[in-house]
Curated annotation (Swiss-Prot):
Organism: Schizosaccharomyces pombe (strain 972 / ATCC 24843)
Primary location class: nucleus
GO biological process: endonucleolytic cleavage in ITS1 to separate SSU-rRNA from 5.8S rRNA and LSU-rRNA from tricistronic rRNA transcript (SSU-rRNA, 5.8S rRNA, LSU-rRNA); tRNA processing
GO molecular function per UniProt: ribonuclease P activity; RNA binding
Reported function: Part of ribonuclease P, a protein complex that generates mature tRNA molecules by cleaving their 5'-ends.
Name used for this protein in its record: Probable ribonuclease P protein subunit 3
Compartments reported by the entry: Nucleus
Similarity annotation: Belongs to the eukaryotic/archaeal RNase P protein component 3 family.
Amino acid sequence: MFIDLNVVWPTLGVKDLNLVKTVKTLERLGYTAIALNYQYDGKLQNVIKNPIVKELYPEQKIKIYSRITLTIESMPQNKVLSNVTKEFDILAIRPIGDRLLQQTCSDLEFDILSIDFTQRLPFYLKHTFMGLAVSRDIGIEISYSSGLRDVSNRRNLITNATSLVRATRGRGIIVTSETRTPLECRAGFDVINLATFWDLKQDQARKSVGESCRSVLLHAETRRDTYRSILNGCH
């Protein structure tokens, strides 16, 4: 049972022919659940609508979740987080800068910490911050597909992923594809083998595409239930 929590939701939505092909490919490769990821890097607004369609073809067996990834340069207001909690199953945060990374790991309620590991990072992956995220049951994501496209990207991905494994001692890591096309999809066992190159132990690599992803889904469900309970208590 493999899970991929980052399949990019295309700009064209369901009109993009690669979308259904990609999902069908992942299903054929043995994935039982995926998250379609709406990448939002614009100005944060109180209302962000969910464009994701979960039922893509009649014979679909794979379970689909909706995910939003917010790229933030300052701490978001509670209204923004409340809105995306209502709209999306999974909330991922991509903070820009060392200070914001620290605040994100310690203060925000979310499910996945997303970092672009194909670039040279402007901060160190300190055990203090990463360990804090892990202790709060936040999944820390390594996405592999962009590292397949370019030599420089691949080199940075290996360096940064290895640093993350060292900072977290291999705990709390999820490996995702961030794929846009069927050609970028990899079978679960291939992803496990890839993850061992970043110094993840074999059992940790297996968890990164299975158990750790299920933990993220449980965390997301609990976060949404808590939000609904608070909302109902206010009425």
